[in-house]
Amino acid sequence: MDLLLLQINPIAFHLGPIPVRWYGLLIVSGIILAYVVGQREAVKRGLPEDFLADLLLWAVPISIICARIYYVSMRWDYYSENPGKIIEIWNGGIAIHGALIGAFVTAYIFTRIKNVSFLRVADIAAPSILIGQIIGRWGNFMNQEAYGGPVSKEFLENLMLPDWIINQMYIEELGTYVHPTFLYESVWNLIGLIILLILRKVNLNRGEIFFSYLIWYSIGRFYIEGMRTDSLYLVGDLRSAQIVSIIGIVVGLGAIIYRRIKVKPAMKYLDNK
């Protein structure tokens, strides 16, 4: 049987003439599940019931816009020649780091307006962010994007992957199978989610769950990015995601060390104020 016939169609279904892509469905599913989990913890930690929903009404669209701006700016040579494609986000091309920057800035401004500690909210939201990223990476899988370098089919079989994943990792235009880097990052984030949920019970200083997320995600992204073939570059061989990841690690570690030394007495995660 033709291998291409076994691959997943990136279009899930049609609403009349409008194609609904798996990519969009998975992104939306990730946001919804992240909200449900985050909302439960937010109320438990004493935030108003509508706080997280109000924040997401601003953070989600701003994050998507920032993610697209980040991606387009890194490939401006292409988009300056094809401006009509700038809005085609349904075909992929949104950068997670751009989305995170947009979300963090929005959350910081929102919490300042509401007179709520940003780090309190960031700690609550950190596991939910990972949930969104875990699911969102499968949108890349459906679109056959964000993959790594060539590998043999035997390599993928040795990873004990099911056939439907192996088949999707065959890229027709390359004529080869590729590293499922989307899966590596999704699994890395799943491990990170488990770690953060454990850290919640330790009752760390305020901000340390969020900074731990920043460190964990950045370490994984740095190494996995080095395997990808579609990286966005800043200058020469410098990959933008790796540079941002280094910054994330430094900021996360630096913030934990600084606050442990300078912020006394420190608020704890379980302090509902």
From Swiss-Prot:
GO terms for biological process: lipoprotein biosynthetic process. The chain crosses the membrane at residues 18-38, 47-67, 89-109, 116-136, 178-198, 207-227, 238-258. Coiled coil: none annotated. GO terms for cellular component: plasma membrane. Its EC number is 2.5.1.145. It is found in: Cell membrane. GO terms for molecular function: phosphatidylglycerol-prolipoprotein diacylglyceryl transferase activity. This is Phosphatidylglycerol--prolipoprotein diacylglyceryl transferase. It comes from Lysinibacillus sphaericus (strain C3-41). The gene is lgt.
